[in-house]
């Protein structure tokens, strides 16, 4: 062989191989699914390239996958006549993993085999799964359009290195030979191999053929028998497709070992003709938060594969959706640039978005437990929706789930429809609070009066919540109201006090004036409040002021944060406020007021500019 060289695997490949062989062994038959799936992708790529260059077929347009085995040599071979690979492509695809974030992903794997198995399955092991059952793998390949002498040989024992060389290969495509480990004889059994192929490959449009050997007149005659249906699953009638076939097809296109939560298969005719098959995964992909990674549907035009990750058909907040769209209205030579500005694309995107939202709404109604699984995995992504998609804001809002004072649990299970159904008579607004954590939201002094009156408050503690609530302003005609902002409806609740209490408050006017004089421009205003029951003081913001949580988001993003000026509200019935009001010594009065303000700021922000000063004041007042 010419040009032979031995190269070392990229370190991530070595790590993946080691983890995969140990954690996927209990489900080892999936190697055949992965290799046939890769062969199917190679055929799709050839069909696409041949649209503009039919010569790539080299007179052989009948694409297929073939599986054969040799019991004497203990080898299993999977071959295709798809697009094939050049030497550089072999090194890129079989010696490295060109996925961003791979290193950190692999570092997240530990000793929990069941968990590792799921994660590696999500990652998409593809070709490397061959090493689960083989102690040596040999690849012979030639790219479509290349001369026979430009074939490539690749071989490895799956340890630290591999060999690559130039060979002559007459036929186009890729041939992978697995030299099976001891104890893997089941994959040399004709019936066993047939059953695996039937299980995993019935939905693939490409014929999968198995070698048949028969003795005739003293000679061995070789023929090939097709053992899958070889019809693209989405082109079949829904009534003919079993749930098991839908699930296997999902695993094929999503490279995910886990079953999907739900799916929707639709054929639309009329002004626009298309077929869509959309899946909701049961687990978030490992790279969902990687901004560089492309997310999207597989695009087919008139059943011809065009591209993976066509992100133009799904809004970003639904980037977890997997599946495909097969359109009859787009040209076969469509490019990403054409898709970007196409009216057809926009119409399809709108229709598919509505389809997914309807699918999720149905899941929420039919199976609350499954929907909760979805929410735990993808809720944070869906919360991007109200800001991104005003047209579907109401539909998205119905799908949101929150923690609330009604359940007093950190689990986000309360829908807005649930909340509205429990609103008190005369209640016109949906009350919520945002905080750094569920515990901080639940124990916020802003809730005291509302809890006392039995009014439910939504407890929001995800980082995205404050940003989301800037766009989600109402639901079912009822406006949202942050309980940490000054509002007339909250004041009405607080003003339900008797006349004697109001007279007592007038006597505290000089006290309020003293506090204002002491704090000056540090606060926007000082006032008495009846919103509190157990807490001496709180700080709140005006309706037009930036909230505390939004200021924190600005700071975390490295942006300049406008100064937040708080309204300092004091509880006239609290013993500490009465103590401060009765203090004539100005120095001690100052200590009391500063301590009350620091307490209120700490409850609101979770931090103080000078915590040491706060501790000193606290200690001084404790010993005085």
Curated annotation (Swiss-Prot):
Residues 1-336 are annotated as: A. One of its GO terms (cellular component) is cytoplasm. Keywords: ATP-binding, Chaperone, Cytoplasm, Nucleotide-binding, Stress response. CDD domains: HATPase_Hsp90-like (cd16927). Pfam families: HATPase_c_3 (PF13589), HSP90 (PF00183). It comes from the Bacteria. Its main location: cytoplasm. Residues 553-624 are annotated as: C. GO terms for molecular function: ATP binding; ATP hydrolysis activity; ATP-dependent protein folding chaperone; unfolded protein binding. InterPro entries: HATPase_C_sf, Heat_shock_protein_90_CS, HSP90_C, Hsp90_fam, Hsp90_N, Ribosomal_Su5_D2-typ_SF. Residues 337-552 are annotated as: B. It is found in: Cytoplasm. Molecular chaperone. Has ATPase activity. Belongs to the heat shock protein 90 family. Homodimer. This is Chaperone protein HtpG. The gene is htpG.
